[in-house]
Amino acid sequence: TAVRILPGENDVSRMTPLKTGRVPLCACGIASYYGSEGVLMFADPNWGPQPIRVITTSIASFGLGIAVAGDIDVKSPKDLKGKRVSWIRGDDALNLGTEAYLAFGGLTWDDVEKVEFPGYGRAFEGIISDQVDTAFTVSVAPPPQQLAASPRGIVWPELDPNDKEGWKRLQAVAPYFQPHKVTSAAGEYSKDNPWIGASYPYPILVANADTDPKLADSLIRVFHEDFDKYKDAAPGNGGYSLDSQNLEWVIPFHDAVVAYYKEIGEWTDAMQAHQDKLVKRQNILMQTWKTYTGNNPPSDEEAFRDGWMDARATALEAAGMNPVFR
């Protein structure tokens, strides 16, 4: 079998060939969820909600969260009240992650000192130089490693998995997060001293709903049945294990993947009900997009986005669903 890989600088560039039909698969980040919802960078006349389906995902040993300077006595998100929290211009995903962590602690942006930065790297430089106290990131990225080695040090606020109300607030902002015991993180963290935090799958192998079922079936069989053959071949491969899959996540699975999980006895009635709800949600979004774009929407980019987000929220709420994004 011949495989051709098309690299992309960001999720939009990676998802464009999937949208146009040039490729059948995308190994994407969390923007695949934004694409399925038609929000943020996908609330654009050229995009809108996409019929995305999950093949499989990887949850590895790293986490995603707010890196905090180690010298301000922060142990959980609620301790961030009154602290200097970074906000990155033009990076919705990072800012939403920060907002979700604040929500876990019962906080909003109004409860902290919001410090704007032009980019992710500058925010970490700001922590080290004592201009700000936090930045959202992947736990194993170079910037938090640099912070850990600085005089300020680093901590990762803990998210108690038993705090049901905290998790409810967090997932109301960013439903793709899930509790995770993080063993790879900058600072004094390890298998023996994990960070009890959060993560979401990365990469997320997605296809379109109409992708050839034979391809989807072949892929999920290989990922599951040949796991022992590839799990140690590269860092993070262990995250593709069946035990690591969240079968009630935020993007629907491809029909062939659902059929396979049923075949091996791993699919429950609750999972099917969740899948049906996600597919219904996506159908509502795509029909709403079709109606909105067919009724002479504003040509101004910001007005177009605002109109779409209003129409989107109205349609989802009418169906008893949480818009999440507004």
Predicted ranges, named:
Residues 19, 23, 71, 103-107, ...:
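Sec-exported extracytoplasmic/periplasmic mature domains
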